[in-house]
UniProtKB/Swiss-Prot annotation:
Phosphothreonine: modified positions: 177, 187
Modified residues (Phosphoserine): 3, 12, 19, 96, 149, 168, 175, 180, 206, 209
Lineage: superkingdom: Eukaryota
Organism of derivation: Rattus norvegicus (Rat)
Entries under InterPro entries matching the protein: TPD52 (IPR007327)
Keyword Phosphoprotein appears in the UniProt entry: yes
Family: Belongs to the TPD52 family.
Subunit-level organization: Forms a homodimer or heterodimer with other members of the family. Interacts with MAL2.
Molecular function, one GO term: protein homodimerization activity
Ranges where the record places region Disordered: 1-26, 189-220
Regions of compositional bias (Polar residues) in chain numbering: 1-14, 200-212
Chain positions found as N-acetylmethionine: 1
Keywords: Acetylation, Coiled coil, Phosphoprotein
Name of the protein in its database record: Tumor protein D54
Length: 220
């Protein structure tokens, strides 16, 4: 058996013999990271594009650092001015809403909604519904007006009755019947009062009683 094809068993006493015949092969670092050239580009164009890409990435890193510094400076200025986070949030929301209103999607949606609204308002169904609601509103207004007139008329009748009743009371008091009744009541009252003043507890005798007297003692 040739020595190059030695047993590679780990338990073999001849292990590692092949390592004596292996030598280090130098590798170009540029070959490791280099990818195959893009189709349609020469090596010179590829190198130029890679150089430009590295430059742009470096500029992006620089701009991020500048932006972070500017944001810190802006936050410090707001803190010194006493601007709250809520006010900043409102400004951001307002700015975002303004951006949304100016966006193409929002404009197209608004135009589409306007077209739909115009179509709906011009449709026969919408017009019939609007006419029906208008007629119902007119009937309701007329019914309320009639009810209000009836209530006002009823209140007017009650007021007129109260006024007539108030006016009729003095007229009734000045009538002959009312005066005759008052005279009779006054006569009876004066007789009762006069009898009590004379020490007599008996009521005045009625006409036609004569000289009849009551017995001294009751027959008990």
């Amino acid at each position: 058996m040739d020595s190059a094809s030695q047993d590679i068993n780990l338990n073999s006493p001849n292990k590692g013999v092949l390592s004596d015949f292996m030598t280090d092969v130098p590798v170009d670092p540029g070959v490791v990271h280099r990818t195959p050239a893009v189709e349609g580009l020469t090596e010179v164009e590829e190198e130029e594009l890679r150089a430009e890409l590295a430059k742009v990435e470096e500029e992006i890193v620089t701009l991020r650092q500048v932006l972070a510094a500017k944001e810190r400076h802006c936050g410090e200025l707001k803190r010194r001015l006493g601007l709250s986070t809520l006010g900043e949030l409102k400004q951001n929301l307002s700015r975002s809403w303004h951006d949304v209103q100016g966006s193409t999607a929002y404009v197209k949606t608004s135009e589409k909604l306007g077209e739909w609204n115009e179509k709906v308002t011009q449709s026969d169904l919408y017009k019939k519904t609007q006419e029906t609601l208008s007629q119902a509103g007119q009937k309701t207004s007329a019914a309320l007006s009639t009810m209000g007139s009836a209530i006002s008329r009823k209140l007017g009748d009650m007021s007129s009755y109260s006024i007539r009743h108030s006016i009729s009371m003095p007229v009734m008091r000045n009538s002959a019947t009312f005066k005759s009744f008052e005279d009779r009541v006054g006569t009876i009252k004066s007789k009762v009062v006069g009898g009590r003043e004379n020490g007599s507890d008996t009521l005045p005798s009625s006409p036609g009683s004569g000289d009849q007297t009551l017995p001294d003692h009751a027959p008990f």
